[in-house]
Design a protein with these regions (language model features):
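Conserved MFS/SLC helix-loop-helix module at the cytosolic interface between two early adjacent transmembrane helices
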Residues: 121-160
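Cytoplasmic helix-loop-helix junction between adjacent transmembrane helices
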Residues: 165-204
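Flexible cytoplasmic loops linking transmembrane helices in multi-pass membrane transporters
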Residues: 42-71, 249-322, 371-393, 574-593
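C-terminal transmembrane bundle
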Residues: 84, 113-116, 120-123, 154, ...
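Extracytoplasmic
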Residues: 68-105, 126, 175-176, 322-327, ...
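Helix-breaking motifs and short loop linkers at transmembrane-helix boundaries and internal kinks
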Residues: 86, 101-102, 133-134, 155-161, ...
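Cytosolic juxtamembrane N-terminal segment immediately preceding the first transmembrane helix
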Residues: 1-86, 99, 532, 537, ...
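Central mid-sequence intracellular linker of multi-pass
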Residues: 2-3, 62-67, 191-194, 219-301, ...
């Protein structure tokens, strides 16, 4: 039955004052009914009904046929690849930019760095608006702006113009915060891991596609073609998205369905969730600021988020440092521009190996969670199981690369093999940390994973410019080996955190203020499994919004206990919303009741 909302403030106050507590029985709550019900239509006269997911589940993204879901996902795969392709292809233009504008190659690399750094912030800035206005218009706007900013970069009259519009391009990129959200729009919580693994591959793979193609471009065309190719790819991607990807955001779909039902006369009192509450109440400036700041707050105050984000960010930053260092390494074997670009393919091979390894690992994880629905370790830390074996590939790969990258008489294939091992680690770390944090933080998973994504892009951007001086100036004659050895030692320390969290995760989560509130809500809302915990949503399914008015934000990719999805009762939804409201009030500095 659709939820009913008063149409004026006095009725709203009355409804609020008489709202039933989860502990109160149905019989006792009935006496608070503000008006008689029309039995024929089950509608309270003069009131609006809110359309919930349970009322039209078959019309939402979760009920799309499998072929349609994976068609949408494949286009989102291309979108994510395009975004990351833009971050890396520019590096092949640095020599041409240096010659054209009379700046050093080191200065020219600032165009890559500023794009990545602003990309880190852009992902966080775009995500809340995709939840408010829908995924489709926000991605179209993002893709369109990025494409527009490519033109002045290619036609730049001076170097400053390149930097300015590369910065705008990075800031305009919506990134993984929106694409991961789309997974949650069309897949239930027990079906999302395979889809996430697919999109994670597009994210890391797009970064490698840049230098592979860039080698051919740099060798045969002017530097501007590194930008024009980004534009061509971007326009084609935007067209595919515009034509073949429908709106998937649950609340927006509910609004549209409600409008159709009113227009057809099926139910003149039905309204979508965003139609019930005015925009200003849902998205005040203060609430938007709180939403934007939450990922950074969690990054600094949550040990799990900080540790796993640093590990993930460091491994990704290595890839962008590699882009700068591979030229130094493989020139020792007289590799040309094209061959240096192709030397990145082993990393891509590593990504494929890791992706395929996760398929049986996900199947194993699902079986374990089903077999032990009340075991916290099985529900949470078991998601890191494969990472116990693949995370050591990071220091192993770096150390092996360090002592096989010294040039002849050592064969170049040795360093390529170890580069592939680093690729296995990079993919595995990103996939496993995203999966774990989403499960651990539930409705705040967007903020938790936002910190992860932010650290990956920000650290990659910050380390892009000093990468070449680092590899050339560290140590003496064996400077390449010494520089990579230092990176291997740093990665060894970070990888230890995986084992600490795997074994001590329950203890760390109990010390987390966010996780404590969520655990309390899970345990007290009639003992329902966490997979039925609605997060910030109307209804029980990922992607819906229940706490949007409170400034709560979610990618809505959930992965809590249990495997099912089902409608949570109105009283349980009410209770969980109040628990989330307590967290949000604390963030705003308000007293909780």
């Amino acid at each position: 039955m659709a939820a009913r909302f008063p149409t004026n403030h006095s009725q709203l106050a009355q409804a609020h004052s008489t709202a039933p507590d989860p502990e109160i029985s149905e019989a006792s709550s009935d006496k608070h009914s503000p008006a008689p019900i029309n039995e024929k239509n089950n509608v309270i006269p003069g009131e609006k009904e809110e359309l919930t997911e349970a009322d039209c589940y078959d019309e939402l993204g979760y009920s799309f046929p499998v072929w349609k879901k994976w068609t949408i996902l494949t286009i989102i795969f291309i979108v994510q690849t395009s975004m990351n392709f833009n971050t890396s292809l520019y590096s092949n233009a640095t020599m041409g930019i240096s010659e054209a504008y009379g700046v050093s190659e080191q200065a020219a690399r600032a165009g890559a760095a500023v794009f990545l750094i602003l990309y880190a912030f852009g992902c966080e800035l775009w995500a809340p608006w995709s939840e408010e206005f829908g995924r489709w218009p926000i991605l179209q706007l993002s893709l369109g702006l990025v494409n527009i900013w490519q033109i002045p970069v290619a036609l730049a009259p001076n170097f400053g113009t390149i930097i300015a519009f590369r910065a705008l391009g990075g800031l305009s990129s919506a990134g993984g915060s929106v694409t991961l959200g789309m997974i949650a729009d069309i897949f239930e919580s027990d079906q999302q891991q395979y889809a996430v693994a697919y999109i994670v591959f597009s994210s890391v793979g797009g970064s490698i596609l840049g230098p592979v193609i860039g080698g051919f471009v740099e060798a045969n065309l002017k530097w501007q073609w590194c930008i024009w190719i980004q534009l061509i790819f971007g326009v084609a991607t935007q067209a595919l998205h515009a034509v073949f990807v429908p709106e998937t955001r649950t609340t927006v779909m509910l609004n549209n369905i409600a409008k159709k039902r009113r227009k057809s006369g099926q139910n003149p009192n039905i309204y979508g969730p965003d139609e019930i509450t005015p925009f200003r109440e849902r998205f005040s400036i203060k609430e938007v600021f709180i939403t934007w700041m939450r990922p950074f707050k969690m990054f600094l105050t949550e040990p799990i988020v900080l540790t796993l984000s640093l590990l993930s960010g460091f491994s990704d930053a290595l890839i962008f440092m590699f882009i700068q260092s591979f030229m130094l390494v493989y020139k020792q074997w007289d590799f040309g521009t094209v061959e240096i670009g192709l030397s990145f393919l082993p990393i891509l091979v590593g990504y494929f190996i890791a992706w395929f390894a996760f398929i049986p690992a996900i199947r194993r994880n699902i079986a374990e969670r089903k077999a032990k629905p009340e075991d916290e370790h099985a529900q949470y830390e078991s998601r890191l199981w494969l990472l116990l074996f693949t995370a050591p590939c990071l220091p192993i790969g770096l150390m092996g690369f360090a002592w096989t990258c010294g040039g002849p008489p050592i064969h170049w294939i040795g360093s390529s093999i170890f580069a592939a091992i680093v690729g296995i680690a990079n993919y595995s770390i990103y996939m496993a940390t995203i999966d774990y944090m989403i499960c651990a933080y539930g409705p705040y998973s967007a903020s938790a994973t936002g910190g992860n994504g932010w650290s990956r892009d920000f650290l990659a951007g910050v380390l892009t410019v000093p990468a070449t001086p680092y590899f050339t100036n560290i140590g003496g004659q064996k400077h390449l080996q010494d520089a990579s050895t230092i990176l291997a030692c740093i990665s060894f320390v970070l990888v230890i955190a995986v084992y600490v969290i795997y074994w001590k995760g329950p203890v760390l989560r109990k010390r987390s203020p966010f996780a404590q509130h969520l655990a309390s809500a899970r345990n007290e809302s009639t003992g329902r499994r966490a997979s039925l915990f609605p997060g910030p949503g109307y209804g029980s399914h990922p992607g819906s919004r229940g706490a949007s008015r409170m400034g709560s934000r979610s990618v809505s990719y959930t992965g809590g206990k249990g495997q099912g999805g089902g409608a949570m009762g109105a009283k349980q939804q009410d209770y969980v919303r109040r628990k989330l409201e307590e967290v949000n009030k604390e963030e705003r500095g308000e007293k909780t009741e």
